[in-house]
Amino acid sequence: MQRNPNPNNLPVELNRTSLYLGLLFVFVTGVLMSSYFFN
C-alpha cells in the first residue's frame, strides 16, 4: 500500500476509507460472533 507515487495527495480520503473499512470489518465480525454464540 506504500507504492502510491503521491502519498500526500489524498491523506484524509485514505484515512476515512480505512476507518470505514475497519468499522465495517468489526461490525461484520461482531455479527458473525453473535450468530455463533446465540446458535
From Swiss-Prot:
It holds the Pfam family PsbL. It is a single-pass membrane protein. HAMAP family: PSII_PsbL. It is found in: Cellular thylakoid membrane. The gene is psbL. GO terms for cellular component: photosystem II reaction center; plasma membrane-derived thylakoid membrane. Keywords: Membrane, Photosynthesis, Photosystem II, Reaction center, Thylakoid, Transmembrane, Transmembrane helix. One of the components of the core complex of photosystem II (PSII). PSII is a light-driven water:plastoquinone oxidoreductase that uses light energy to abstract electrons from H(2)O, generating O(2) and a proton gradient subsequently used for ATP formation. It consists of a core antenna complex that captures photons, and an electron transfer chain that converts photonic excitation into a charge separation. This subunit is found at the monomer-monomer interface and is required for correct PSII assembly and/or dimerization. InterPro entries: PSII_PsbL, PSII_PsbL_sf. GO terms for biological process: photosynthesis. This is Photosystem II reaction center protein L. PSII is composed of 1 copy each of membrane proteins PsbA, PsbB, PsbC, PsbD, PsbE, PsbF, PsbH, PsbI, PsbJ, PsbK, PsbL, PsbM, PsbT, PsbX, PsbY, PsbZ, Psb30/Ycf12, peripheral proteins PsbO, CyanoQ (PsbQ), PsbU, PsbV and a large number of cofactors. It forms dimeric complexes. Its main location: membrane. The chain crosses the membrane at residues 18-38. Belongs to the PsbL family.
